[in-house]
Design a protein with these regions (language model features):
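Glycine-rich loop motifs involved in handling phospho/adenylate chemistry
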Residues: 25-29, 139-143, 552-557
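Generic structural signal for small/hydrophobic residues in well-ordered secondary structure
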Residues: 13-16, 23, 44, 60, ...
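Residue-level signal for the membrane-embedded core of alpha-helical transmembrane segments
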Residues: 32-35, 294, 298-301, 351, ...
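Membrane-proximal extracellular/periplasmic loop immediately following the first transmembrane helix
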Residues: 37-103, 212, 216-224, 237-238, ...
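Alpha-helical transmembrane segments of integral membrane proteins
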Residues: 1-21, 278-280, 310-351, 358-479, ...
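N-terminal membrane-entry
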Residues: 279-298, 380-381, 385
Length: 590
């Protein structure tokens, strides 16, 4: 009997080639889009879950509230890890990262490259994180100063077939770092992927003896802690308040501020963190919800299209249903037949969808910035999900046509008196209306995203970023030769201006407490600042509303002059006349 259902279904599909092609094509395209989105979402949700101790790894975050500024840092001071481990027995170990200025010029013999991901880390990194060393001893690889562990990729890049261990890399043409280990390339689904881990002891950081100042100064270090088994991290967070009260309260009271520390679960950082100073760019859980919704909408649209095409042909198949009922076919047999046809069309569409995913994945990767592969399709969880999706789509896509067609009365059909009930008409209209609604929602959403991207690309930033090339100069010897380099560059006919600054206009700037002279010392204003030369304003085409630019004609400008923006004027309360006012820098948090 089942074989007859299949034969009949295949004959009907062959007899209606155009309808079958349209149905399969629509469903295949919809499933293709849904699968690509599913792969993207699955990859985003998998970040940092490959670490064996992921459920016990937490990042320490610093939150500081002053009267005119809320600071939410992903970083801490360098003393945070050691102090917390000594203070709280729930903390088994810690690891610190210093990533500020992570771009470095690395040299080995005649090979020299500028690397973007050079950071310092404690040796405990290999105990806490699942970064596997292929060469070297994880217990001592980063204990000594001026040692470095590199990835497989970097080992091949600099050393080729040589054994890197024991060799020296020159950093910024100054410091030599001995390679003490080679580790596997860090997986793409890690929220930070350095190529070089240099020993934290190289930085030679020592406490000043004033714990409060140590904790509130230079909040530039990412600190992860490994909690002991069974520790409730929320309870531990509550204990941090006693630590703050005991050590930081006098300093915070002087600035009329508050501070607290929070723990971020490792597996939530990539999608849920909204803190300043992340190791690398993170994702956003809102996009996961958005793309998941889009994927479901597309799949729903494909199913609705499948159902509408099937019901639209109901009149053409009415006589077939009537004849089958006359010769004894029962309704449940007809339902099985139509569901069988739906399953054949669906499985054909799914197979085509898998082929389309294979061919479109490189394009999708280039657009999304991912490195997705078909490997995920071989996992049991995907196979189970794919089968459930197939059954669901087959049933949803074929259920209404099956129940609708099988309900025809044979006498009315054969006598040409087929009447379509009001309920059926209403349902078909509802399906078509829903299909158009989903389509319109997707189109409007696409247009909104496009307009938002155009706004971001074209919004005015307050400075000119076009035709500007930025070069980082870390080497002190090169910095001393800046004026000579500047003079040489300006000789080129295509270079109009050259300037130097401590950071880019929207880069990582110094963050400090400022006091307006003449006001009570308790009134502090937190401001970002950077050091620039007299050509900075002109190079970036920044408009000066009041006053003048820095000038070499005024030697005091180099140490005693500042230019502030309109936002700083409002914060300092100088709306009437900011020119000639004086400010002092108190506490620095960078």
């Amino acid at each position: 009997m089942f074989r007859n259902y299949i034969k009949t279904a295949i004959r009907n599909i062959r007899r209606n080639k155009l309808y079958s092609v349209l149905n399969v094509a629509g469903l295949a395209i919809g499933v293709t889009c849904c699968l690509l989105i599913l792969l993207y979402v699955q990859d985003e949700l998998s970040y940092d879950r490959f670490h064996e101790k992921a459920d016990r790894i937490f990042r320490v975050a610093t939150i500081i509230d002053l009267k005119d500024r809320h600071m939410n840092f992903a970083s801490t001071a360098h003393v945070q890890g050691p102090m917390f481990k000594d203070e709280f027995p729930e903390i088994e170990n810690y690891v610190r990262f210093n990533y500020y200025g992570s771009r470095r010029v690395i040299q080995y013999k005649d090979r020299s490259f500028t690397e973007e991901k050079f950071i310092w880390a404690d040796n405990s990194i290999f105990e806490i994180f699942s970064f596997n060393l292929l060469k070297g001893n994880p217990e001592s690889a980063l204990v000594e100063p001026n040692t470095v562990v590199i990835t497989e990729e970097m080992a091949e890049k600099y050393f080729g077939q040589e054994d890197p261990v024991g060799k020296n890399l020159r950093v910024h043409n100054e410091t030599l770092y001995m390679v003490t280990g080679v580790m596997e390339n860090i997986p793409m689904n890690s929220h930070f992927r350095p190529d070089f881990f240099a020993s934290f002891s190289t930085l030679d950081l020592k406490p000043t003896g004033n714990p409060a100042e140590d904790l509130m100064s230079n909040i530039d270090y990412i600190t992860f802690v490994l909690l002991r088994e069974g520790t409730d991290y929320k309870e531990l967070e509550g204990k941090f308040m006693g630590f703050v009260e005991r050590i930081l309260k006098p300093l915070l009271d002087a600035y009329e501020g508050e501070a607290r520390y929070e723990l971020d679960p490792l597996t939530r950082i990539y999608l849920h963190s909204e803190r300043q100073g992340e190791l690398e760019q993170t994702g956003d859980i809102a996009y996961i919800y958005l793309f998941s919704g889009i994927g479901l909408f597309i799949l729903l649209l494909a199913c609705l299209n499948f159902m509408n095409l099937s019901t639209a042909r109901s009149a053409n198949r009415a006589k077939e249903v009537g004849l089958r009922k006359v010769v004894g076919a029962q309704r449940r047999q007809l339902i099985k037949q139509f569901i069988g046809e739906s399953m054949i069309l669906t499985i054909t569409a799914f197979v085509i969808a898998l082929v389309l995913v294979t061919f479109t994945m490189p394009l999708f990767n280039s657009i999304s910035g991912k490195t997705l592969t078909m490997e995920y399709f071989t996992k049991l969880q995907f196979v189970a999900g794919f089968f459930c999706l197939f059954v669901l789509v087959s049933f949803i896509g074929g259920s209404y046509p099956a129940f609708f067609l099988s309900a025809f009365r044979p006498v009315e059909v054969l006598q040409g008196r087929l009447r379509r009930g009001t309920k059926s008409s209403v349902l078909r209209v509802a399906l078509v209306s829903l299909q158009f609604t989903v389509s319109i929602v997707l189109i409007i959403g696409t247009l909104m995203v496009d307009k938002q991207l155009n706004f971001v690309r074209n919004r005015k930033l307050g400075y000119n970023k076009d035709h500007v090339i930025a070069l980082r100069i870390r080497n002190e010897e090169t910095q001393k030769k800046y004026e000579a380099i500047k003079t040489e560059l300006l000789r080129h006919p295509n270079i109009m201006s050259v300037t130097a600054s401590s950071s880019l206009p929207l880069g990582r700037n110094s963050f400090s407490a400022h006091h307006a002279v003449g006001k009570p010392e308790s009134e502090l204003t937190m401001l970002f600042s950077q050091i620039v030369d007299e050509d900075f304003i002109d190079t970036y085409d920044i408009e000066i509303v009041k006053g003048r630019n820095f000038s070499k004609d005024f030697p005091t400008d180099r140490k005693e002059a500042v230019i502030i923006n309109e936002a700083a004027v409002r914060k300092l309360g100088w709306q009437d006349n900011p020119l000639g006012q004086q400010i002092e820098v108190f506490m620095s948090l960078d």
